[in-house]
């Protein structure tokens, strides 16, 4: 019993340390995306990355995590949300704390990947709506397929240890769809009188 408790504590600490490192990826993404955009849009990019985490936290707490880690799944596709957070918030968080924090930062990462692909071409309010949707439905459902034992991909033996499919593939596919919808950026590369492209805001990235 002492060994089992110690092992669980080590696993929990590992999850929390990993979550802290992934959390700082938000700052990294913000700097990279700022480096790819014009200086006048730097503040917009920073706010979008901040909103990914803020909005994502609220919706992931309310429904996303319960949907992702549901105990009952419908044909392995969609989980029946665990609504214990509304009746026993303290107990729910205490029991699932490390897993919740770990998946929360991954959810924010998946949402942030899209920001760079649609930089300078989306309104702030529209982006906030997108951020809420992906954090509330898209990420919890597809991550549940992989990381919940009841998910259909998990049932087939699919294994994704670090999130290459659950996070980066989903973020990349969503970014591609968004980039196709909004089209190319206009006015990013402007030539001077000599025909040379003016400097871009690449230092932060």
Give names to the regions the model predicted:
Residues 1-7, 11:
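Single conserved hydrophobic/aromatic residue that forms the stacking wall/gate
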Residues 12-13, 40-56:
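Loop-to-helix transition at the N-terminal end of transmembrane alpha-helices
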Residues 27-35, 109-115, 170-196:
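Juxtamembrane interface elements at the cytosolic ends of transmembrane helices
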Residues 60-94, 113-121, 141-154:
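Transmembrane alpha-helix boundary signature
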Residues 90-136:
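Hydrophobic alpha-helical hairpins/lids featuring a short glycine-rich hinge
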């Amino acid at each position: 019993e002492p060994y089992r408790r110690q092992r669980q504590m080590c696993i929990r600490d590992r999850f929390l340390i990993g979550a802290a490192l992934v959390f700082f990826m938000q700052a990294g993404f913000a700097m990279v995306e700022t480096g790819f955009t014009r200086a006048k849009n730097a503040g917009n990019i920073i706010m979008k990355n901040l909103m990914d985490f803020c909005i994502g936290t609220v919706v992931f707490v309310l429904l996303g995590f319960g949907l992702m880690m549901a105990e009952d799944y419908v044909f392995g596709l969609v989980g029946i949300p665990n609504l214990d957070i509304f009746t026993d918030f303290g107990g729910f968080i205490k029991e699932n704390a490390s897993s919740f924090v770990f998946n929360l930062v991954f959810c924010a990462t998946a949402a942030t990947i899209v920001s760079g692909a649609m930089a300078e071409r989306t309104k702030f309010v529209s982006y906030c709506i997108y951020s809420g949707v992906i954090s509330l439905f898209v990420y919890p459902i597809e991550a549940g397929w992989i990381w919940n034992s009841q998910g259909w991909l998990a049932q087939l033996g699919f294994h994704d240890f670090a999130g290459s499919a659950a996070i980066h593939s989903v973020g990349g596919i969503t970014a591609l769809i968004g980039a196709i919808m909004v089209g190319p950026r206009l006015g990013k590369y402007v030539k001077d009188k000599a025909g040379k492209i003016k400097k871009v805001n690449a230092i932060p990235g």
